[in-house]
């Protein structure tokens, strides 16, 4: 919910949400999630592109039309694609988990430009992404307390799955 407003997941399809080992939504739930997004398709018989509700076979919709639009909306920074981020970053899940919880006020003597935030786990301690998590930000259906720690765990678990959606199945072979 929170990350998808800026970050893409271009290697994940909506159908993956209903597969074993992942979030395991029902097929109907995954269809409803897909249909809540507009997808550009085409061309039609007249050679024109058109918009339609998403379907299970579609990849996750990108939050921006292109790199320049993403940079313009994010102070010049391009939010990385999240679908394989835990595999691309040194430290993987542990790094992202720590990064999500590493926001602090900068130490005395450190000044930051507008739109730059201090994060004790980011290389150089400066990051363009503001802290996205706060206690109570989301509501869990099972009543789980939505702490920053819990949401960080859930985000990184989900991102590990997106990077290796069939890992569990391969391990059972």
Residue positions per predicted region:
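The canonical Cys-X-X-Cys-His
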Residues: 2-10, 155
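Acidic helix-start/capping segments at beta-turn-to-alpha-helix junctions
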Residues: 9-35
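Surface-exposed patches in mature extracellular/periplasmic domains of secreted proteins
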Residues: 10-14, 108-113, 167
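C-terminal single-pass membrane-anchor helix
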Residues: 166-173
């Amino acid at each position: 919910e929170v990350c998808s407003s800026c970050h893409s997941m271009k290697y994940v399809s909506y159908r993956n949400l209903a597969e074993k080992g992942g979030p395991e939504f029902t097929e109907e739930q995954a269809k409803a999630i897909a249909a809540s997004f507009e997808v550009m398709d085409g061309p039609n018989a007249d050679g024109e592109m058109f918009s339609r509700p998403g379907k299970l076979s579609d990849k996750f919709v990108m939050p921006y039309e292109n790199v320049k639009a993403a940079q313009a909306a994010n102070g010049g920074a391009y939010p990385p694609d999240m679908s394989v981020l835990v595999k691309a970053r040194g430290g993987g899940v542990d790094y992202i988990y720590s990064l999500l919880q590493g926001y602090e006020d900068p130490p005395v003597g450190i000044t930051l430009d507008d739109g730059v935030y201090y994060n004790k786990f980011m290389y150089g301690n400066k990051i363009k992404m503001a802290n996205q998590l706060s206690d109570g930000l989301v509501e869990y259906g099972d009543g789980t307390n939505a702490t920053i720690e819990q949401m960080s765990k859930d985000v990184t678990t989900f991102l590990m799955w997106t990077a290796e959606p069939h890992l569990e199945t391969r391990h059972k072979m």
